[in-house]
Every structure is written in structure tokens, then in C-alpha cells.
Amino acid sequence: MTIARSLLARLGLVRRGVPRDDTLTPDATKHDRRAMDRALELARGAAARGEVPVGAVVYETATGHPLGEGSNAREERSDPAAHAEVEAIRAAARAVGDWRLNHCTLVVTLEPCAMCAGLIVNARVGRVVYGADDPKAGACRSLYRLADDPRLNHRASLVTGLERESCAALLREFFRARRNGS
């Protein structure tokens, strides 16, 4: 176990075999479903550009009005922080003229990583909806619980598994093609 993982385990941020119960998770709404459709379109566009196929949309929770969107752009920008969630949250903050996004929902095709989960907390995003779990880097539920950790100054409610199979299939196909040299 690495020092960092050991520290995270002591802080209770590492999942140990059995996932914790998501008691705060509400069901997906029609706005979530519409945003996920768009996030999947964005993810397909990322794949066509040779990027890992992840798409994200931020919308105003009460109205469903879209405020920002993004897809992975790490390769084309040579920017390790150019994740779909970062792009969507930045665009939403610019659109509303405020970094506080309590009134917003982030919909993303893949469970956010630690960097993106930290941004979710710092931007105070109210809800997060994601499709596929990420057992290797997921920081909302799979490996860590950063987005709803009660010790942090903000917690987002989570909805998981929306269009799970579509999101996971897109990733599987992308990495299969990459391994086969396509």
C-alpha cells in the first residue's frame, strides 16, 4: 500500500470491499436523462478525436437549463487537467458569473476522478449524476467518497448508474480499438 493510499485509508476515504449505502441518492430526473444524452454525444465526439470518451454537462437543477458542457481534451491540449467535468464546470461558472454552483447538477458519463471530485466540492455543485463506475480512479463511490464526504465543507448528492451500460460500452469499445491499434 502506498503512503498516500495508506493515509487515505486512515481518513476513511478508501472503499474496503463493500460499498457504502448511498442513502442520499435520489432517482434520475427527465433533465438528468436529457443531459446524459448530450454527455454521451460529447463523449462520442471525444472518442472521434482520439480522446478518452467522457462527456459532461452542467445544468440548472430547477429548470434543466444547460449552463456548460465539455469532453476530455487532454491529448489535443496537452493538458492533464482537461477533463470533461473541468471543462463543463468552468463553462457553467462563466455562464452564471459565480464559482458557486449549489443550484446546479453535473451529469457525466464516467464517475469523476479525485481531481474532478475535488473540483465538484470546491465549486459546490449540488448534484452529480454519472453513468459508469470507475473502479480504477473513481472518487465519488468506487475508490473514494470525496463528493459526499461529511468531513468536507460541501457535499453533493449522487445519482449513479444512469445509462451505465451505454457509458461503459463506449469506454470498452474505445480501449479495445486502442489495444488493437485501430
Tell where the protein language model's regions lie, with residue ranges.
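Zinc-dependent deaminase
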Residues: 1-46, 112-115, 119-182
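A structural microfeature
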Residues: 67-68
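Short beta-strand scaffold segments in enzyme catalytic cores
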Residues: 54-60
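Glycine-rich oxoanion-binding loops at beta->alpha junctions
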Residues: 86-93
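A short, polar/charged loop-to-alpha-helix boundary motif
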Residues: 76-86
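Short, basic and Ser/Thr-rich N-terminal targeting/leader segments
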Residues: 50-54, 102
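Immediate flanking context of iron-sulfur cluster ligation sites
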Residues: 98-110
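Glycine-biased flexible loop/turn sites that connect beta-strands or occur in inter-domain linkers
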Residues: 63-64
